Amino acid sequence: MTENFILGRNNKLEHELKALADYINIPYSILQPYQSECFVRHYTKGQVIYFSPQESSNIYFLIEGNIIREHYNQNGDVYRYFNKEQVLFPISNLFHPKEVNELCTALTDCTVLGLPRELMAFLCKANDDIFLTLFALINDNEQQHMNYNMALTSKFAKDRIIKLICHLCQTVGYDQDEFYEIKQFLTIQLMSDMAGISRETAGHIIHELKDEKLVVKDHKNWLVSKHLFNDVCV
């Protein structure tokens, strides 16, 4: 039984490493020699995946689920990153290691592949293709951060909420032709926290969008019409 368990664990790890190899566009054979340094872990909704700088020695590949990364600067400001499966994180300090105060939490049940940050940095130095791919991903990460900040600059609360919903659809939404689907985790409280407005105001705006058939609550998921984004999407 022990041998079967180890075999199953190794097969799972190999499968996820192949997924990572596809994501960063390299042959699996480049990662295979380092399989023993990697791990696969499962997290339940609400569980902390890491809190840096104490746990910043790993890079993670999100295999399944949704996460929120809350980055705290020296002034106490909070920057939120939302991610769904098929993303590598955190990579902003990959080439310039520094302490980053970032809390990463599972918004839904999640599965992640972990590997040492030093290993990824070494692979980048040894392989130009990996470096170029990671550099492009870092730029995408910065663009996401910029879009989030642009949404927060909207003068009117309703515009701010709409742009934040648009931002979430683009980052963690699932394209379903006429609408986007956002899984489980989105709540009125989270929207009010993101927009910096009261829960009551956020709830009133969402209610208006529901009346206009632009947002529909389907069980715990949100269905967002693409008509919502006309002329306001950042």
Swiss-Prot record:
Induction info: Induced by arginine and anaerobic growth during the stationary phase. Repressed under aerobic conditions independently of the growth phase and by glucose catabolic repression.
Pfam families: cNMP_binding, HTH_Crp_2
Superkingdom in the source lineage: Bacteria
InterPro entries: cNMP-bd_dom, cNMP-bd_dom_sf, HTH_CRP, RmlC-like_jellyroll, WH-like_DNA-bd_sf, WH_DNA-bd_sf
Coarse class of the protein's main subcellular location: cytoplasm
Gene Ontology molecular function: any one: DNA binding
Protein name: HTH-type transcriptional regulator ArcR
Protein source organism: Staphylococcus aureus (strain NCTC 8325 / PS 47)
Lineage of origin: Bacteria, Bacillati, Bacillota, Bacilli, Bacillales
GN (gene name): arcR
